[in-house]
Amino acid sequence: MTSPPDKRIKRIKTGFFERRMEMAKAGFISGSKILTHSATNFWASPEEKERNNKKLMSERAQYMASEMGKLKGSVVKIGQMMALYGEYFLPKEITDALHTLEENTAELEWSAIETQLLQELGAHKLAKLEIDETPLAAASLGQVHRARRIEDGQELCIKVQYPGVAKSIDSDFNAIIQLLTLSQMITSKRAFEQWFREARAMLHQEVDYLQEAHNTEFAAQMLTGDLRYIVPQVFREFSSKKILTTSYEPGLVVTAAKVKKLSLRRRNHLAKASLDLFLSELFAWGEIQTDPNFGNYRVRLGDGKQPDQLVLLDFGAMKKFPPNFLNPFRNMISAAHHNRRDAFLENAIALEFMRADYPEDVLQNFADVAMEIIEPLAANYHNVPDFALNPKGEYRWAESKLPRRVAKKASQASLSKYFALPPKEFMFMNRKLMGVYSFVKTLGAEFNGGEVLKKYLS
C-alpha cells in the first residue's frame, strides 16, 4: 500500500542557504510579532497582559514548530530533541508545540531512496535483495524498508538515511540558534548552550549508522542468553555509514489492544524487563540508550513455550557516561532507595545539584522531591499513599499519580532560587528514567520496583 501523493516528497531541502533562509524568515516573523504585541498590550491591565503574553507565546511556538516541520531532516530531529529536554531552557509553550513534530512524517519518494542505496551499497549488493518500495516507517532523518535476501529468504529491515542530512546538521543547529535568538524564546542561555553542545554531538553520532551497528552488536552481546529480549542481527554486508541493515523483527507496539489485554502477570513480566534493562545499562554497562521513544520497542507475544519478549529496535542514541557522573548518580539512586537522606545529599552536592552552604530546609526540600521521584524503586512503601498500592502492597504504576505529586511538591518546595543547572548528563538520564516509568505505567503494571533494583545494590 503506497502513501497518498501529498504525503510523499521528492527531495529534502539540504542546501545551506535555503534552509538558513527559511529559519531566518521564521525568526524574523516571530520576532516582529513581539513588536506588534507590545504596542497593543501597552494599555492592558496586568491580568490582561499575562493572558495576552501566554497567548502570544503559544501562537509563536506553534508557528515555529510548523516552520521547522516543513524542512524535515535534522531540523525536525533537533525540534524533537528540544521537546524532550527543553524544559531546562525553553518556555513550556515552546516544548508543548515542539511535541507536535510527528516522528512518522512524509516519506521520501522511492527514486531518491534507491539512488542513496546504489551510492552506498552498489548495484552488485542490491541485486542480492528484494526491497519493498513502500517504507515501514518514515522519520526525520531517514526511513525504513522491509527487504528479503534472495539466496535464502532472510527477512531484513533496511534503514536508509535521507540524502544530505548528515552534512546539514551543523548549519541546521546554527539556524535554530538564530531562530530562537531572534524570537527571544530562550529562558536560560547557559542551559541552552550546554544542551546544544551535547545534542549536536549526539546527533552526529545518530547519523553514523556504522556506530549504531556497533551499538546494536554490543547490546546483543550483553543480553546474550536473556530470553526476555530480542536484539536484531546486523548484516554488515548491506550496511554503511548511511545504511543499516538488520534482521526483520516483528512485534506489537506497547499500546496495542492485544498487549493491553494480556494478564497482569504477563504485563508485569514485560514491565520488569523494561526496568531491568535500564538498570543494567546504568549499573552494569555504563552505556545507556537515551532515547525514551516508545517506537524503539516492540512486544513479541509468547506462544506458551517462549515467554513474551521485548524487541529492541534502535541503538543510535547510545551514550557512554563518564565515571565522575555515573558513580555519584548510582549512589544517589542507592541512597534514595534506602531513604538515606544524608548520603543522597552528599552525592547531590558532589554532582553540583546543590551546594553544601545552602540553607538546611532547602537541602531537605530537595531530598523530599528526589525521594518522591524514586518512590517506585524504594526499599519499602511506608510513605506511599494507599491509592498507589494494591491489596498485596504492590506498587500500582498507572494509579500512583506520581508525576502530579512530584510537580506539586517541587512547586511547594520553592527550589528554583537554589536549584543549580544539572549536569548535562542528567538531562539525558532523567528523561530516560521518566521514559521507563511511562512505559511501565502504559503496561498497567503492579510490582515493587525496589525488588528489581536491589540486586544491583549488593
Task: Describe these PLM feature segments.
Residues F283:
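Helix-to-catalytic-loop junction in kinase catalytic cores
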Residues N339-R341:
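Conserved phosphoryl-transfer catalytic core
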